[in-house]
Amino acid sequence: MKLDPNEKWSEEKDPRGYRQGDAIPEGDPVCIVPWTTICLSANGNIKPCCAYDADNDNKHFNFYYGDTLEDAHLGFEWLRKAFANQEKPAQCNQCWKNESTLSNSRRSWVYDKIKNKPKSYPVESPLKLKHMDLNFGNTCNLKCRHCGSWGSTNWFKEDIKLNDINKKFKRAVNHAKVRDVDPNYWIERQHYFEDMERIDFKGGEPFMQQGHYDVLKMLIDNGSAKNVELGYVTNGTKNPEELEELWPYFKRINLNISVETSKPGLYEYFRGGKIQNIDQLEQSIYWFDQFDNVNAHFSIAISTYTIFDLQELGDWIEQITSSTRSFKTLLANRTSDHKNRYEKPNNFNSVVSDPAYLDPNNMPPHMKQKVLNRWNKNYHNMEHLREAMLRTEYDPEQWELFKQYTKELDRIRGESVLDHIPELVGEL
């Protein structure tokens, strides 16, 4: 269902309640994030949510520069006012773009996840968190091609080299340093978690960050774990035994395993090394499937590198979900009407838009047609992806940047994209 401001959700239309993908109910702000949520990014930026464009902001708040969550919450008063007035600020363009492309967005996700919503939305609002995106740093064992130093310590050297080659690659060289939040910061501020419904851990790779385990132990010790849902975005390379002791204390574990392709060879190429192949990822999935309180999904960031094999990834997900308990949510044949929707679909719900040269919508028409010629199934959101590709005008500059970026990174890593994506033969 497309997010349409003229088609507001109501209990009469769907008595099962609001679900992600519905339009925000009439009378509520455009987005409830700055009243309920806050995000500490891996680079230390304090933002309303992970989709917020802090680089487009007049005032930055950063944990490593001494800013506090209170400072940021007060600083976002203008955003609460804008949302209360039904405005759509430029800093939130990712939501508006995702809604037009995928009929989904972060603001819709938050509205779905926060169950005990505020009764009112005053502009001058106290910091009373229901949800937190908590990232303890950028430590990661992979260097995926759509990532950078902000999200992986393995990107540092290559980011510097790419930045020297072409500044238009927009590599995050200012983040090429190890970030590591001291867990004592949170342990000394347990009042932040008094009304918490959900905490999402990302990264870096969250299972490689000791602070994450320390916070879980804190929530168990103070008795609040039973009321808190945990969310993760993990690359699936780590299966920490410590989780077997900690996770059962929590209300629910929402596990999102990132996977962009299931094609052997391309999987390793995209992730930047031989640390794990697709068969090993499957074994990791079966390990996570042992937990009774885990709801598991796949986090899929669609880029020019992976869009050609998107339908095959859908087939792979169908095969995995048919043989697991926690991943018992099918991707195929999820219809757009409320009556027949699956409760927890594994959908294609994210397109890489930054950097823009990795956005498949910026490919030339003949390349888009190559993609569309491969699709003959109607996995959820593929119809929206198809519409967006046809609707979005080709950007020659971004396509040239994609080709240069790919060739230069291939040279640095000693690889060739043509070994894995034959559709690009003759293009580079």
Sequence positions of predicted segments:
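Leucine-rich repeat
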Residues: 186-192, 217-223, 246-248, 288
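Short cysteine clusters
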Residues: 31, 49-50, 92-95, 140, ...
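Core AdoMet radical
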Residues: 129-139, 148-181, 194-210, 222-241, ...
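C-terminal accessory region of radical SAM enzymes
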Residues: 2-18, 51-99, 292-295, 338-344, ...
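N-terminal [4Fe-4S]-dependent radical SAM core
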Residues: 2-29, 34-37, 45, 68-135, ...
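Distinct, well-ordered alpha-helical segments
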Residues: 211-217, 240-247, 309-313
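Catalytic cores of alpha/beta
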Residues: 304-320
